Amino acid sequence: GESTHMTSWQVSGRDVFEAIAKTMIGRPVVGEYALEDMALDLERLLDRLSIRRAHVVGISMGGMIAQVFAAQCPNRAATLTSISSAVGNPRTGFGNLRAIAAVAMTGSDGNSAAQHYTHILRTLAGPQYPPSEAELTEAAKLKLAYDAEATRRQLIALLASGNRSRQVRELTAPTLVIHGRDDPLLPFKAGEETAALIRGAKLIAVDGLGHQLAPALMESYVRWIAEHCHAHPA
């Protein structure tokens, strides 16, 4: 995850912006791993836990991993819920530069990294769901071990997977797409595209929501996902 320590591989913010630039002009990006590898981790975890089928839910990059898992293991994804995510299409999946820079140009270790993480939360939040000071303080505590390089490695990993539109179009798992209309990192049109590509997918558009899991909407998230899963039992 974002806080995984792999100090032997140094990745700079410049590397991330170069990878983004390559994606924008259609050039391939090479990373140490890609979304497909991370989806394989999920498959192996389910094997280890002896779980044959699962309801797969992911937000942002996690949503992309969930999409890839549902494509690679169609018989094991009972449902798919893709939240604030995208399919890797550079025409729809890039938000504003300020949001991209906030994620790519992360802070250093310890307290400065935690402070920068609160900056990310403020930058990515939607106008109707700004994070409270209490939420920011708690998030900072949880991110004292935040690994900036891990975040940048993961950004390169998702760019290395390229445009997955064709793969996503072939998904058969019942799919729910949830996306904020004011997402500055992965624009709402990315969520619209995801839902349009998958046959029978349902799109829930949330006004005023950015690239975030807003605590004020937690009951709604639970209800939406529970209804989706209950409609398609594993």
Q: Where on the chain are the PLM-derived regions?
A:
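Alpha/beta-hydrolase
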Residues: 95-166, 173, 193
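Flexible "cap/lid" loop of the alpha/beta hydrolase fold
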Residues: 71, 80-108
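Glycine-rich "HGGG/HGxG" loop immediately N-terminal to the catalytic nucleophile
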Residues: 1-33
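Catalytic active-site module of serine/aspartate enzymes centered on a nucleophile-bearing elbow/loop
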Residues: 201-234
